[in-house]
């Protein structure tokens, strides 16, 4: 509406001055519009805006601007039905031109001439550029591993630091603590550090020293020492936990019979013990910090103790599924002697399995053979091949000596959140001792990272046969209140790989599995069958009464 058409008003209702102050704007159709779409063309807008190319004058007397040689055109939506995002095309293009075939380059936007520095020499050429997705609908298709990429071999046990027998717990660490920064700090304060295991999510660490004297000295010097902007807390790692009444709860099975009363509930005095009770740490297979491993079985097996129970950890649920199909398992080297001894002296050895960070027990099985010592029978660990996107095997990073810190190496097992440093030993070439588990992967060249395909990253485990009795999942919260007197009277969910359960506690835990049959069925395969077995078909351990409350 022009100004002359505005009716004259008097007084406060005269809006002529306001109308003159407002900018004038016109609506025009696009030059190639088929009549179904309008363009809003404000006055004074830049002619280079995509979709606003003007070939006719906007104001009277203004000459036509003509076509812009470097102007990009926006395709209407009705021409984009087979494309995931709008594409921009450089150079003058009419709507009658056939649409270029972009099917061979999905998700790659096309930039016109305006992105080239010398567009005069290339009046109608465009380049493809790989670009980060700019729209929600645009994006690279998710990486889907081929069906045959699922490995039929388990990944093997995790790496653990050397256990000297003299360890301290270091707490109150800052968040995002760097491992080597802490190692350098400990070595500056005290001598004799053998290994240091960092637990980032608990803001604490375990440090092993070569002897008792250096361990005591380090504990005194590290306590209240300033690290970055905080004061550290250090305590000796003990094998026993003393209760409020002065009664010491054993950390391993004693020579007493299972019929004896369970020690009263103890009060945890170490901060790490309180952090271990959290659910997010309960299913993590943290290394044993003390040098003398927790006793996994009684020195003398009582004649009445015909059943033994152990908790075994797995790196992944897939490894357990494979064991269900094959009936074979392999454990860490420091567990082999205890399992073999239990199999020879007890009538039944029951193994309760849990995958790390799963928050539940996978199931339980019965050991039906001793561990095979024949090297030819060893089973392969770790996937046969690793792609670039699946670099989750443990890495070994050497560290050079400094003024205070000796030469060592970092073991980074990011797949399970494990990282530690240990000193380099001169006798490492003589072989791995019984206390030190075999490496989970072969040595890798840092330049190739083991990804060149010429060599396979593998290690070997000693297998034994087992019979799966149940793969009914048992969440940890259903075991609340069930404590193991052979593990400092902690809850059964807090256990390392190879922890033995007191027989009466083991029977109760298996009873919880059988009570879970009324709950929704297991999510994984069972005994190699394509379908789940009904609760009535589940086998109950021989001689056990029905589940009880």
From Swiss-Prot:
Residues 71-102 have a biased composition (Low complexity). InterPro entries: Nucleotide-bd_a/b_plait_sf (IPR012677), RBD_domain_sf (IPR035979), YTH_domain (IPR007275), YTH_prot (IPR045168). Signal peptide: none annotated. Residues 49-61, 251-260, 273-289 have a biased composition (Polar residues). Disruption phenotype: Significantly shortens the half-life time of the APHA mRNA and decreases the APHA protein expression. GO terms for cellular component: nucleoplasm. Residues 307-513 form the YTH domain. GO terms for molecular function: mRNA binding; N6-methyladenosine-containing RNA reader activity. One of its GO terms (biological process) is regulation of alternative mRNA splicing, via spliceosome. It comes from the Eukaryota. Pfam families: YTH. Residues 29-102, 139-165, 243-262, 273-298, 425-458 are annotated as: Disordered. Specifically recognizes and binds N6-methyladenosine (m6A)-containing mRNAs, and regulates their stability. M6A is a modification present at internal sites of mRNAs and some non-coding RNAs and plays a role in mRNA stability and processing. Directly interacts with the acid phosphatase APHA mRNA to increase its stability. Belongs to the YTHDF family. YTHDF1 subfamily. This is YTH domain-containing family protein 1. It comes from Cryphonectria parasitica (strain ATCC 38755 / EP155).
């Amino acid at each position: 509406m022009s100004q002359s058409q505005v009716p004259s008003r008097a007084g406060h209702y005269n809006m002529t001055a306001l109308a003159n102050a407002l900018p004038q704007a016109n609506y025009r159709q696009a030059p190639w519009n088929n009549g179904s779409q309008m363009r809003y063309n404000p006055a004074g807008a830049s002619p280079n805006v995509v979709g606003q190319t003007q070939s006719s004058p906007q104001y009277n007397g203004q000459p036509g601007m003509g076509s812009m040689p470097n102007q990009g055109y926006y395709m209407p939506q009705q021409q984009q039905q087979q494309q995931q995002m709008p594409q921009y095309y450089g150079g003058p293009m009419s709507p009658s031109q056939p649409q270029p075939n972009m099917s061979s380059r999905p998700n790659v936007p096309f930039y016109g001439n305006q992105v080239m520095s010398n567009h005069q020499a290339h009046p109608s050429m465009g380049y493809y550029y790989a670009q980060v997705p700019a729209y929600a609908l645009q994006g690279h298709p998710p990486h889907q591993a081929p069906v045959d990429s699922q490995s039929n071999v388990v990944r093997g046990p995790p790496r653990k630091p050397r256990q000297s027998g003299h360890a301290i717990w270091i707490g109150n660490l800052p968040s995002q603590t760097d491992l080597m920064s802490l190692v350098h700090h400990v070595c500056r304060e005290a001598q004799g550090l053998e290994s240091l295991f960092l637990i980032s999510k608990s803001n604490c660490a375990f440090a092993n020293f070569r002897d008792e004297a250096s361990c005591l000295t380090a504990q005194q010097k590290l306590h209240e020492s300033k690290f970055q902007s905080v004061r550290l807390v250090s305590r000796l790692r003990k094998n026993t936990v003393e209760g409020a009444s002065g009664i010491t709860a054993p950390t391993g099975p004693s020579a007493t019979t299972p019929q004896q009363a369970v020690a009263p509930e103890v009060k945890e005095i170490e901060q790490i013990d309180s952090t271990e009770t959290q659910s997010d740490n309960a299913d993590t297979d943290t290394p044993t910090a003390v040098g003398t491993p927790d006793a996994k079985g009684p020195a003398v097996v009582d004649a009445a103790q015909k059943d033994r129970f152990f908790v075994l950890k797995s790196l992944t649920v897939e490894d357990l599924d494979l064991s269900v199909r094959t009936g074979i398992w392999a454990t860490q080297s420091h567990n082999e002697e205890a399992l073999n001894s239990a199999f020879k002296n007890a009538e039944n050895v029951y193994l309760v399995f849990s995958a790390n960070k799963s928050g539940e027990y996978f199931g339980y099985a019965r050991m039906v053979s001793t561990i095979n010592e024949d090297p030819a029978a060893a089973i392969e660990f770790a996937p046969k091949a690793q792609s670039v996107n699946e670099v989750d095997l443990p890495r070994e990073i050497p560290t050079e000596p400094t003024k205070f810190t000796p030469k060592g190496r970092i073991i980074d097992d990011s797949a399970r959140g494990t990282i530690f440093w240990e000193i380099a030993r001169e006798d490492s070439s003589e072989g791995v001792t019984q206390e030190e588990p075999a490496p989970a992967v072969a040595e890798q060249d840092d330049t190739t990272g083991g990804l060149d395909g010429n060599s396979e990253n593998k290690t070997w485990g000693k297998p034994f046969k087992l019979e799966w009795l149940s793969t009914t999942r048992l969440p940890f919260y259903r075991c609340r209140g069930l404590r193991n007197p052979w593990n400092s009277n902690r809850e059964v969910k807090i256990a390392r790989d190879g922890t033995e359960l007191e027989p009466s506690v083991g029977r109760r835990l298996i009873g919880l599995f059988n009570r879970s049959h009324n709950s929704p069925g297991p999510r994984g395969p069972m005994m190699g069958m394509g379908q789940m077995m009904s609760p009535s078909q589940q086998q109950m351990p021989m001689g056990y009464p029905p589940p009880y409350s």
